[in-house]
Structure formats: C-alpha cells, structure tokens
Regions:
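Short helix-loop boundary/capping segments
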Residues: 347-367
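Interface amphipathic segments
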Residues: 1-195, 207, 214, 218-325, ...
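Short, solvent-exposed loop/turn segments enriched in Ser/Thr/Gly
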Residues: 332-333
Length: 496
C-alpha cells in the first residue's frame, strides 16, 4: 500500500496510526516506513514516530524497529534515535533490546543527552511499564536507573530514579551532565548517590530528589574546594530547584590561604539562579565569611564574591604563611571583594584593618647575612621589634597577575626586645607612619612574605655570583670588542 491511516484500539488503548509506504502479507512479512503513532486520549496523546518498522505476521507478531522517537506529552524529556525489537502476543506489546538517546525538551537544555541500551517496555491493560539504564555517552558511565509506569487512561505516571555511587573523575565531570555547571565547577572528584522521582498527570509534572556525597572535591573560581559532604534536597529535580537553605560541610577551601571545617548555605531557584546565603570557616583564631551573593548558572556574566575576615590573629596568619623568622601580634578585620568575568579574577578594594590598640611586628631569627656591616647590623637590631597603633592592608589586582598591596602602619615605636640607643630614643619622640607598597603576582606575593624573613627560602647571592665573600658586588665581566671580519666589506666608493 502506498500509505496507511488507521484508528482503533490496541487492547483498551486508543491508537491512531499513519505511515508512508507499507508492505505486508498475512501470514508473512511487514515493512513500513515513517510510521506515526498516537497512543492514549486524543487531547493528550503520547506520540511515537518510527522511521523503519519490520516484522513477521502470524500466530505471534514480532519484528524490529529503528529510527524511532517517543514523546510523552506530560514529561519534558524525549527519546530519539531509538531502536530495538517488538513483540505483540496475548494482548501485550513488548519492546526489548532498546537503545535510545534521552533529550531535554526545554529550548535551553538543562541536561545533556544520555543514552541507553537493553531497555525494555511492556504495554498491557492500558499501562506502560519500562526500565532503562541511562549512561553518559562519552564515558559510558551509568548515571541513573529509571523505572517508569504510565496509565494511558488517566495520563498519570511516574519514574523512579536511582543514582548508585556515581563517580566523577577525569572521565566524567558535572558539565558533561549539565551545561549549568560550566564556569562554576571544574576538576570534580568524588561520588554521589541518591534517589529521585518524577510524577506526571495530564496537566502537570512534579519531581523531587535527594542526593548525598561523603567527599567531593572540585575547583571553583575562588580556589580549590576539598571534602564537601552533605545531602541536597530538590523540590523540582527537572528544573534543578532545591529547598531553601541547603547546607554542605566543606573540609577545606584555598582562596590563597587554606581554611578548614566550613559550612555553606545555598539554594537553587528557578531559571538556573544560584543563591548563596553565606558560608563561614574558622580562620586563624577568627572567622572567614563568604557574604551572600547570587549568580545565574550557565551564563557568561560578571560574578562577585566577598570574603569577610573577622578577628584574624596576626600571629596565626604569620604561621599560615610559614614566615619562620617573623612574629606578630594583633587582630585584623576586613573584606576582600573578588570579581570574576571573562578576563579572569581580581581583587577590588580589599582592605584589612588592625583592631585597637594595635600590635607588634618583630624579627626573631638570625640575620640572613653576617657581613651586612656594623651600621646596618646596629640599625637592624634596633628596629627588629616594632609596636604599632594602627595598620591597614589594601589589596587590588589580578589573581592570576599582579596584586598591589599597600601597607600603612601608624604610631610606630620600638617594641620589646629591640636595642635602644640615642638615635632610636630621639626617633621615638616623633610621630611615625610607614607606607609600604608591594607589587607582585598574587601567588608569588605569598611566597615573597616568607622569603623576606626565612634565610633558607631563597638562595644566597654569593652562591649566584652576585657578590663576593665580603658582600661586595661583583662587577659584570668585560665583553671584548668584536674582532675585524675575515672578509673585507664591500667598497661602495665611486671609481672612474
């Protein structure tokens, strides 16, 4: 037949079937192209299109299909490129050896395609029951097992989802499952387990889920994050919406100085909006807070984070930076605003301020070089301990480039342990302010603090041939003048 147009019932289920060219014999073979099937009530049909349908017609009806697509009206997920076997016996339609791709129907896909093989489906008594194991295609890793039940009469159904110890590593990353993770999470390592459920009627779809990790590591824009643990509850799993105030423990985070044992509060809202309610960590006898912020997942936009330092102890800070020959006393508060965009990350207007009544900076190690000279050694011993009444530290610049650090130290006097003499006693009567500007790459800046005070951290310039054994600079070697060329240069004079 050149074409086919049928309507009726498959068991108790209304069915409308149309196709292009069809060839069949009874008993015998069936071959059909471009088959369009609508199952269920006319106002909310479940549609199936099949590019190729073949089979054997007799006591049992069976065959193969390929190039099929399936769409449940109430569920915003579509099956494409489906193939497998079919069998109709005793009023029961069975599909087996099913392979397909699962796509998000939303225009801006929330989920990347998943694939299945060896899926199965039965239609009996007007009810569909299906089982499929869904995999991420590039890694072939199982993401979830789905068990589906659907009543064609009521257009109601549900899908139970099981995620069993899903491993994220160099083969599978969050952004290979959803584009919303791009620019938010990278280099993920860890396992996630949980369950989800999707329920639908002819009018609405609801979906929920709970997913847990015991240890999840990843790289974020503001630094590496290790040991994330906890459970996240979704109130709209398909829409990636969570219940308010989801909390995760964070073993450590390193925005430049590593901090430990924190907790993050957040929620995911409709349209891919991540709301960070805040996070906090113990920080060198004080606290480090991530202030509330909002960002659109999957969008190329400027993102701002602010780290707030409360009651940071200067002595602990020096230890964190491994300044083995430096000691400090004082308490600091401040904020470090971080901005991330397509040009990278930077600090804008970072400021740390010492609390009253001030503090102390002191050098507690031996001099790096023993031959600095009598006056230099005398001055160093006199100023090796400084008390201050006020200190501010300003920070600006690119996180992957140069950071400008401005130190302003007010009310400077000699501290305990410094040698006093006539000069220092006269200086002590004067109001002194130190203004120090440091310009260096951010990561190198942290190392520079240590190299200033730890003689084992940098190489001796005498070993590099920059100074002699007495500390005097070594003159640069004299470069001899070039020898006359072996070949006479051309003579360009005019000759008669």
């Amino acid at each position: 037949a050149p074409a086919l147009a049928l309507s009726g019932r498959l068991g108790d289920t209304p069915i409308v079937l149309r196709s292009a060219a069809v060839g069949f014999a009874w008993p015998g073979s069936l071959a059909a192209r471009n088959v369009d099937v609508a199952l269920g009530q006319p106002d909310a049909p479940n549609r199936f299109t099949i590019a190729s349908l073949t089979g054997q017609l007799g006591t049992n009806l069976s065959g193969q299909f390929s190039g099929a697509e399936a769409r449940l009206d109430a569920v915003p997920l579509d099956l494409v490129d489906a193939s497998g076997t079919w069998n109709y016996t005793g009023g029961i339609l069975s599909l087996g050896e099913g392979a397909f791709r699962l796509l998000d129907r939303v225009a801006d896909d929330r989920f990347r395609p998943l694939v299945a093989r060896d899926a199965s489906l039965t239609l009996a008594d007007n009810r569909i029951a299906a089982l499929a194991v869904l995999r991420e295609p590039s890694s072939d890793r199982i993401v979830t097992e789905a068990k589906i039940a659907h009543d064609l009469d009521s257009a109601r159904g549900h899908a139970d989802l099981l995620v069993a110890d899903l491993l994220f590593d160099d083969r599978l990353q969050p952004d290979t499952l959803t584009y919303l993770a791009l620019g938010v999470i990278a280099n993920a390592e860890g396992r996630v387990s949980g369950t989800g459920r999707i329920d639908w009627t002819g009018d609405a779809v609801t979906s929920t889920g709970r997913f847990t990790t015991d240890k999840f590591n990843f790289a974020a824009a503001f630094g590496p994050v290790d040991g994330v643990s906890g459970t996240v509850e979704f109130t709209d799993l398909l829409g990636l919406v969570t219940a308010p105030d989801q909390r995760l423990k964070i073993a450590s985070i390193n925005p430049g100085i590593e901090v430990y044992d924190g907790e993050l509060s957040f929620q995911l809202e409709p349209d891919g909006l991540l709301v960070v309610n805040g996070a906090e960590w113990p920080f060198i006898d004080g606290e480090l807070h991530l202030l509330p912020t909002r960002m659109k997942l999957g969008a190329a936009e400027q993102r701002r984070f602010t780290l707030k330092v409360v009651g940071a102890d200067a002595a602990q800070f020096v230890q964190q930076l491994e300044m083995s020959n430096m000691a400090a006393r004082g308490v600091f508060d401040g904020e470090l605003p971080l901005v991330f965009d397509e040009d990278g990350g930077r600090i804008e207007g970072g400021l740390l301020t010492a609390r009253a009544p001030g503090g102390n900076l002191s050098y507690i190690g031996a001099l790096t070089y023993k031959d600095m000279g009598a006056m230099a050694n005398f001055a160093f011993q006199s100023l090796r301990s400084l008390d201050f009444k006020g200190m501010t530290i300003g920070l600006d610049g690119e996180l992957d480039g140069e950071i400008f650090t401005r130190l302003r130290i007010d009310g400077v006097t000699q501290g305990e342990g410094a040698k006093r003499n006539f000069v220092t006693r006269q200086v002590a009567r004067l109001p002194i302010r130190f203004n120090i500007n440091i310009r260096a790459p951010f990561q190198r800046l942290l190392h520079s603090f240590r190299s200033l005070y730890d003689p084992t951290y940098v190489r001796d310039p005498r070993d590099l041939g920059l100074v002699d054994s007495n500390g005097r600079p070594i003159a640069a070697p004299t470069i001899p003048a070039p020898l006359p060329p072996d070949i006479q240069p051309p003579d360009s004079r005019k000759v008669p």
